[in-house]
A protein has these predicted regions:
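Short beta-strand/turn micro-motifs at beta-sheet edges
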Residues: 52-56, 175-177, 274
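Soluble periplasmic/extracytoplasmic beta-strand elements of cell-envelope proteins
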Residues: 140-142, 286, 371
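Mid-core helix/loop region of P-loop NTP-binding domains shared across ATPases and GTPases
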Residues: 268-284
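Short proline/glycine-enriched turn/loop segments at secondary-structure junctions
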Residues: 129-130, 274-275, 359-363, 370-371
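N-terminal "pre-motor" subdomain/linker immediately upstream of P-loop NTPase catalytic cores
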Residues: 22-160
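Active-site phosphate-binding and catalytic loops of NTP-dependent enzymes
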Residues: 95-98, 262-271
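P-loop NTPase catalytic phosphate-binding loop
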Residues: 1-24, 62-65, 71, 147-267, ...
Length: 431
């Protein structure tokens, strides 16, 4: 009797799945064709209307890849512009039911089989599909059933996975993405306020201090008053923090002098670059906010010079801004920077100023979601590191003497009326 009930329930589950498939809940291939047609991705040839034609469907662990032939008259960029329409269309009701036969392979013929089926249904309610497009003569549409995580908390093991001048950036569906500053020396980071730009700068600095404490020299330019980099000010690795345009110019002039000296040394010794010379030291120049430095032409000229000549001499430039424009990021600078971490931006024009193409304006409104662009483009969820984690990592590298001087000055200031310093006269042998 129990076996008959259990068997009936199992058959019922399979019948339910079959009906859902007939309703089109799992038939993404036909959905994609309908979405494309409804979005205008079709051409007229005489009396016939042609749209994409499915040639191949390949199932993988991460989801399904569909290969389509594009009708003559349409380009890959036409489909790229409709990526959000495709993703939203595929998720129409997919949050409710999205079953496949293998989902039911885990069923066991036990008394609780109805509960097992219900658990499968409940889990499938949480699914949101994400897609990627590529083109190699055929339009490839990858439909991912497992999305990029919406939040990734920093763990020190992420830094331990990095070698040399690698730093953790974020996660894709496939795992951790790292950036190697010895492979791609310079980076642009851009994004709207509170989307994660400052956090990724702190993640990079903290990772480098932890892994390359003996070999890194940091020159920080923060034209928002120095607050972004305030907790790093007493690090042994920090050479200077510029908090206004005047200090920035002084720092950049000093850096240009160092750059000239190192290049002269390499020329004199016959070395091609700093790696051949066996010099492990790297000079990191981190600028936040680029738009505020743009009006100062000499500052801009030196930054462009560091981007152009700095790689061989061991200089690394990270250039960050909330307001990407062609004036804040001149083409001479962009041409020499091979890596971009771009968070959500308001306009396609802003995205083009950073990535040389649109896309950042279409990122979901998720804090930390970014496009990591090198020779290819990946959407990542950047790693979030909180201030307590930063302090724990950098604490061994703080200059104790400088910290004590700061704390003593703070106590003296707090002990004076109205928070002002008082004049103290001491009797000496000359008085």
């Amino acid at each position: 009797m129990i076996f008959e009930l259990v068997s009936s329930a199992a058959v019922g589950g399979v019948v339910f799945l079959s009906k859902m498939h007939q309703k089109g809940a799992t038939n993404d291939a036909s959905k994609i064709q309908r979405i494309c047609a409804n979005c205008g991705l079709k051409v007229k040839e005489g009396k016939e209307t042609r749209t994409i034609q499915l040639l191949r469907k390949t199932r993988n662990d991460w989801g399904v890849e569909y290969a389509y032939r594009i009708p003559l008259g349409l380009s890959f960029s036409d489909f790229e512009q409709k990526i959000q329409h495709l993703e939203d269309g595929l998720n129409h009701k997919s949050k409710v039911y999205d079953f496949k036969l293998q989902d039911f392979k885990s069923l066991r013929l036990r008394k609780d089989i109805l509960k097992q089926i219900q658990n499968i249904i409940n889990k499938k309610k949480l699914v949101r599909k994400e897609i990627e497009l590529s083109y190699d003569g055929l339009l490839k549409i990858r439909v991912y059933e497992k999305g990029i995580p919406d939040f990734v908390k920093f763990k020190e093991d992420m830094i331990k996975q990095c070698r040399g001048w690698e730093v953790p950036i974020g996660y894709t569906r496939d795992g951790l993405i790292k950036h190697d500053f010895d492979q791609l020396s310079h980076m642009i980071s851009a994004g709207m306020t509170d989307m994660g730009k400052s956090n990724v700068l702190k993640l990079i600095i903290t990772s480098l201090v932890r892994n390359q404490s003996e070999n890194i020299k940091l020159f920080l330019v923060d034209l928002k008053g120095g607050l972004s980099f305030n907790r790093y000010r007493f690090l042994n690795q920090v050479e200077s923090i510029a908090k206004n345009p005047e200090e920035a110019l002084e720092t950049l002039r000093e850096l240009q002098d160092k750059l000239n000296a190192r290049n002269e040394y390499l020329l004199e010794k016959g070395y091609e670059d700093i790696k051949e010379a066996g010099d492990p030291v790297r000079y990191f120049v981190i600028v936040d906010e680029a738009a505020d430095i743009a009006p100062y032409q000499e500052c801009q000229d030196i930054i462009v010079d560091i981007g152009r000549r700095g790689r061989a001499a061991g200089f690394r430039l990270i250039y960050a801004t909330q307001y990407p424009t062609n004036s804040a990021m001149p083409s001479q600078l962009r041409q020499n920077i091979g890596a971009r971490v771009c968070f959500r931006l308001q306009t396609e024009a802003g995205s083009r100023a950073v990535l040389d193409e649109g896309g950042a304006e279409s990122l979901p409104n998720i804090k930390g979601r970014a496009i990591y662009q090198t020779n290819e483009k990946k959407v990542v969820q950047t790693v979030y590191i909180d201030n307590k984690q930063i302090d724990n990592i950098i604490k061994p590298h703080i200059n104790i003497k400088a910290r004590k001087e700061y704390e003593n000055a703070k106590v003296s200031n707090e002990g004076s009326p109205n928070g002002k310093y008082t004049l103290e006269l001491e009797e000496t042998r000359l008085s």
